[in-house]
Structures are given as C-alpha cells and as structure tokens.
Amino acid sequence: MDLISVLALWPYLLPVVAGGAVWAMRRSFASTERVERLENRMTEMETRYASIPGTEDVHEMRLRIAELSGDIRVLSQRVQSFSHQLELLLENAVNRSNS
C-alpha cells in the first residue's frame, strides 16, 4: 500500500482515529452525573458549615466565659459570707434557747 492510496482513505480513517482518541480520553473527563453529585455534596457541606462559629465568634465566647468566671467567683464569696453569717445566727439562736 503506497502513500497515495492511504491518503485517499483519509475521510474514512479520520473519524475512526478521532473516535479512538475520544474513547481513550473518556476516563480523563468527569461525567455529568459525577459532577452533579460533587456539586450536591459541596452544597450540603456549605449549608452545614455555614452555621459553625468563626474565629471572631469563638474569641467573643472566650471573653464572655472569662467574665462569667469572674462573676461566679464573686458570687461564691458572697454565698460563703452569707453562709458564715447564717451559722453565727443559728449559733446565737441555739445559745439563747439553751439559756
């Protein structure tokens, strides 16, 4: 087979070669179904993580927790002083009833 007879067959060979190339490359391209599944997953993740607090929110929460911790310490000291005063009052009441 000489070159001229091969060139005469080019209209028939070109679609076969192009089809073979597309068939060989089909794995390198994502299917529409796969892309849609990935888009759905991405949308679901974006929706789920949209409500997660950011760094500023976490920082603000830490500050508020520190404030609450200080308030709790103050309240604890006040409760202890009230408890001590109640003990003294009860002791005084018991001593009066014994006399």
Curated annotation (Swiss-Prot):
Its main location: host cell. It is a single-pass type I membrane protein. It comes from the Viruses. The chain crosses the membrane at residues 3-23. It is found in: Host cell inner membrane. Keywords: Cytolysis, Host cell inner membrane, Host cell lysis by virus, Host cell membrane, Host membrane, Late protein, Membrane, Transmembrane, Transmembrane helix, Viral release from host cell. GO terms for cellular component: host cell plasma membrane; membrane. GO terms for biological process: viral release from host cell by cytolysis. Induction: Expressed in the late phase of the viral replicative cycle. Expression of late genes is activated by the viral late transcription activator C. Facilitates the release of the SAR-endolysin. This is Releasin protein. It comes from Escherichia phage Mu (Bacteriophage Mu).
